[in-house]
Curated annotation (Swiss-Prot):
Organism of derivation: Campylobacter concisus (strain 13826)
Name of one Pfam family that matches: MMR_HSR1
Name this polypeptide is given: GTPase Obg
Stretches assigned to the OBG-type G domain: 159-349
Annotated positions binding GTP: 165-172, 190-194, 212-215, 280-283, 330-332
Gene: obg
CDD domains cross-referenced by the UniProt entry: Obg
Localization terms from the record: Cytoplasm
Keyword annotations: Cytoplasm, GTP-binding, Hydrolase, Magnesium, Metal-binding, Nucleotide-binding
A single cellular component GO annotation: cytoplasm
Classification via InterPro entries: G_OBG, GTP-bd, GTP-bd_Obg/CgtA, GTP1-OBG_CS, GTP1_OBG_dom, GTP1_OBG_dom_sf, OBG_GTPase, P-loop_NTPase
Length: 352
């Protein structure tokens, strides 16, 4: 099950109490204090693991805590430190304060291990309180209390290319055609209910990761449809590929306008990312050339045919306000799919 948001309360361990103890041995009269210190409470860590892809392990858990430190003992023996709590999360997991929405830590790299909550310090045993005035102290410190906080974990997938389009425009068909991902594909809207990642191999030495998210509809940034819960998954993508359906009842210009507006409403940073446009399902389109021409006029672009591309910029004079390319494709017939992969790789290399 794909779970990308959970809320739970995390607590470190309470420090163990120091011991009140006196040396008791044969032939030792009035042995001095020998109470050991309490053990420190367990810490809380977040650990980033590439083999984990969801937050499902934490669904339904209201609270998790590390172990308390054990109390000190006689003979100046320190109590055992509490066992730490490690939360294994996938790359792209952000940890927020559930009350203030403050970002507390961001887990993005394989092997990253972040100390999140420190366990309470163990209390001092009565051995530490012996002095010239009081040779037999009968008190010790209690352990320090644990730290506790309610957090919200949000998973935002990390990919190179994010697919942006209305439902049923061919995003899942494309990612299954170019990568190892096998999303559910059917001829109805919202077939994709969870995000999918696919590794696209361009040649023997190059490739990139593509993310397919559920289709965007007008009002998605305000929570309509599957809304913001999935728009967040393209936040970390390096570039965006807008999928414009040439066989849709909406005009190409209407589709593009709504998609750009929803992305901009959701995040101005995301809206400023470099992007390209794929005109999909050209095998099923009518009046394709005429409709493409009208679309390009609507976004103030002059056609500059470059091979199979109806529009393509020169990377050396790149204008980020315009798409890098506009390419008609068909995932069903593999028309221009190789050209699409190489062009996306070119744009990604510009980002490096």
């Amino acid at each position: 099950m794909f779970i990308d948001s959970v809320k739970l309360t995390l607590s470190s361990g309470h420090g163990g109490a120091g011991a009140v103890s006196f040396r008791r041995e044969k032939h030792v009269i009035l042995g001095g204090p020998d109470g050991g210190d309490g053990g420190d409470g367990g810490d809380v860590y977040f650990v980033c693991d590439n083999n984990t892809h969801t937050l499902a392990n934490y669904k339904g858990k209201r609270a998790m805590r590390a172990s308390d430190g054990e109390a000190g003992m006689g003979r100046r023996m320190t109590g055992k430190k509490g066992e730490s709590l490690e939360l294994i999360v996938p790359p792209g997991t952000a940890v927020y304060d559930a009350q203030t929405n403050e970002l507390l830590c961001d887990m993005v790299e394989e092997g990253q291990r972040t100390l999140f909550l420190k366990g309470g310090k163990g209390g001092l045993g009565n051995f530490h309180f012996k002095n010239s005035i009081n040779q037999a102290p009968e008190y010790a410190q209690n352990g320090m209390p644990e730290e506790s906080i309610e957090v919200r974990l949000e998973l935002k997938l990390i990919a190179d290319v994010g697919l942006v389009g209305f439902p049923n425009v061919g995003k899942s068909t494309l990612i299954s055609a170019v990568s190892n991902a096998k999303p559910q594909i059917a001829n109805y809207e919202f077939t994709t209910l969870t995000p999918k990642l696919g590794l696209v191999e361009v040649d023997q030495f190059s490739g990139f990761v593509m993310a397919d998210i559920p289709g965007i509809i007008e009002g998605a940034s305000d929570g309509r449809g599957l809304g913001v819960q999935f728009l967040k998954h393209i936040e970390r993508n390096k570039i965006l590929l807008f999928m414009i359906d040439s066989a849709n009842y909406r005009s190409m210009s209407e589709q593009f306008s709504v998609l750009k507006e929803e992305v901009a409403k959701f995040s101005s940073v995301l809206a400023s990312r470099d992007y390209a446009i794929a005109i999909t399902r050209v095998d099923a389109a009518e009046n394709l050339d005429e409709n493409i021409s009208e679309f390009m006029k609507s976004i103030n672009l002059e056609p500059n045919q470059v091979g199979k591309f109806v529009y393509k910029q020169d990377l050396y004079s790149f204008d980020a306000k315009k798409p890098y390319f506009i390419l008609p494709i068909s995932s069903a017939t593999n028309e221009n799919i190789d050209e699409l992969k190489f062009a996306l790789l070119e744009l990604l290399k510009k980002e490096l």
